[in-house]
């Protein structure tokens, strides 16, 4: 029997195995940020332990950083403390830090790939659930808790059980104004937020092979929203072209050796998957969430389902809270729903490709009077590239705020937040209650959909503008 990509990655990193179920895996890359790292470092100090492989650990500030300016003195108390602690810890333990004033600082899941830290064949961990993003490169990447962060720092290993495997084959034609965000939202709707629990999901098919690395990262980024441990896409020529000449990518003869190895990182034709799903997206329309879970999704031209038709809920009462929270009703269409704020950013959709898609919508237009719209590049490198292309001017001239890199309004841990009852068109990954601010209402959409909502002042079907 052949092996899946997941099993090839897992097996090649086993340091110690017990009963063919639980293994200790070697960790190739450990990414850290200011929120989940402080307690781990404090514990190392208490136990008088050193970091096993400091050069395989990289840090950045992203969750708490202010995006208006770089003065952390204006940040809230806990955010300020966490950033100061990360700076001190990285200095004390000799860890490379892309701090708040570094020109390449950015969201950890944007920074890692664009610097070439993320490479095919690796096992990658970070104290952040959206570490699954890096699986787009054919790496086994997953989020870990703070106690596990400490363990990896101390040993460069981590105990992991073997997981089940799922293959989602995506076929068909990608329609105009349909993006990777729409594809993954539609898949989450189909599988639900629990459909991937206990699995590593490998995405494949003719659609995946056409996607850029930025789009593949969007797909893998949100695999966690199905409950999956990680998402995977086998590396190919698109992967290699993206990685070539990156700061940490192999160089010269090592590059050729790497390509030879990376070419083996694909599931064998006779590999067994515990579950296989095939999805044709030829009829897919732009997607939008209507509730408070990422699987509460509809097409922009589709009404919110009636209670009786929602099989994902065990009883009708379970639907009342999200609709009440969002101020919506069953049967309602969202294509004229007024928005208060628009957020284009996050580790899901803050790369140059995402900003181009949004800029293409807003060029020679202006943000509606009722809307406050911000664009937050995912990193300093993304910001620089966008400015070289003139994207910043397109956004600024259209009435958007052009911000500094950071996680920003994806989560209410910094100064960018929704006020109670404010409705936001957001390119982020989670629409939980209070995620973007207390009592804020979040609708997940693609960058193009968010940009259009900013211009019209309400959601629209971007295929018709």
From Swiss-Prot:
Pathway noted in the entry = Amino-acid biosynthesis; L-leucine biosynthesis; L-leucine from 3-methyl-2-oxobutanoate: step 2/4
- Entries under CDD domains matching the protein: IPMI
- EC number annotated for this UniProt entry: 4.2.1.33
Q: Looking at the record's lineage, which domain of life comes first?
A: Bacteria
Q: How is the cofactor bound?
A: Binds 1 [4Fe-4S] cluster per subunit.
**Matching InterPro entries, A to Z?**
3-IsopropMal_deHydase_lsu, Acnase/IPM_dHydase_lsu_aba_1/3, Acoase/IPM_deHydtase_lsu_aba, Aconitase_4Fe-4S_BS, Aconitase_4Fe-4S_dom, IPM_dehydratase_rel_enz, IPMI_cat
Pfam families the UniProt entry points to: Aconitase
Q: Which PANTHER family match?
A: 3-ISOPROPYLMALATE DEHYDRATASE, HOMOACONITASE, MITOCHONDRIAL-RELATED
Entry-linked HAMAP family: LeuC_type1 (MF_01026)
NCBIfam families listed in its UniProt record: leuC, PRK05478.1, PRK12466.1
- Please give the name of this protein: 3-isopropylmalate dehydratase large subunit
Q: What species does this protein belong to?
A: Buchnera aphidicola subsp. Pemphigus spyrothecae
Gene for this protein?
A: leuC
